[in-house]
Amino acid sequence: MMASKDFLDKLVQTCPDGIIGIDRKGTVIIFNAAAEKLTGLAGKDVIGKLSIQDVYPDPEIAREVKKQIYSKEHGAPGSVEGLEVTVKGPEGRKIPIRLSAALIFEDEVEVGSVGFFHDLTDRKELEEELRRRSITDSLTNLYNRRHFHTTLMEAMARFARYKRPLSMAVFDLDNFKPFNDTYGHQEGDNILRLVTECTRSVFRQTDHTFRLGGDEFAVLLVETDLAKAGQVMERFKAHFTEEWSLKMEYLGRTLRPVTMSIGVAQLAVGEKADKFQLRADLAMYEAKSAGGNRVVLASKKIGE
């Protein structure tokens, strides 16, 4: 059997998690193959030459890790378990890891510490993908109704704090069901995707567009008053009509024209979210009742 030191060296080097050992001064003295892969650094360039602080993207992280090791928050004093931090990866990327570390003592004297670095990149990417799917409409890749309510409350909180105007537009496609019945759901889906393309051409990155369901959509226009929001939605409506015509011309097809009815409301001071949305909805219904293919600005109060 191989000598115990050789066995321990093999054990350290073959461990799938990064292992970094430091002396009492903070200089790296152990840097296994997994740590090399994680950070993009070669052990020969690290051991005896770099400090543990050089492994983290921010010195504050190293200080926080040291603080946690000496506290009881993540384990017994002298150790830390499951602390999620980031380390510097190849090309300066920040790599999320789960850190477990412990102080090393000889004759009750602290001589260094060892840390185990478990790469969380795959898990974090999966979590982000699941989060994205939970707030996104699968057909259009716009935000869904669930995220609409969350985003609306956040936007209203900013409005209450900064007093900058916030407007909402709600719109749907005129006679969408007859269109679907005539040409099939695939053609209907193509229209919904075209709506998405047009939103990206007209609205700012700071605005938020949602598919609420079916052919109903909503847009939150930040720092935009009612008059300006109305102008933006008129431009959006015209752009959609133009893109639809160009698409039909390109495909050499003649389908029933598609238009939209749009209602726009501006948030009033002290107004609740449900009333804000209701005013936009009522304005949209008014546009539809008047024949569709138009933008209607909501009254400040319901019934006015």
Per-region residue spans from a language model:
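A short pre-motif secondary-structure segment
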Residues: 208-211
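Conserved nucleotide-binding and Mg2+-coordinating catalytic segments in signaling enzymes
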Residues: 131-150, 171-184, 193
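Terminal output helix/cap of sensory domains in signal transduction proteins
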Residues: 57-93, 232
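PAS-family sensory/regulatory domains
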Residues: 45-60
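Sensory-domain boundary capping and coupling elements
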Residues: 99-101, 117
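Short regulatory alpha-helical coupling segments
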Residues: 131-132, 145-165, 196-204, 222
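PAS-family sensory domains
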Residues: 109-119
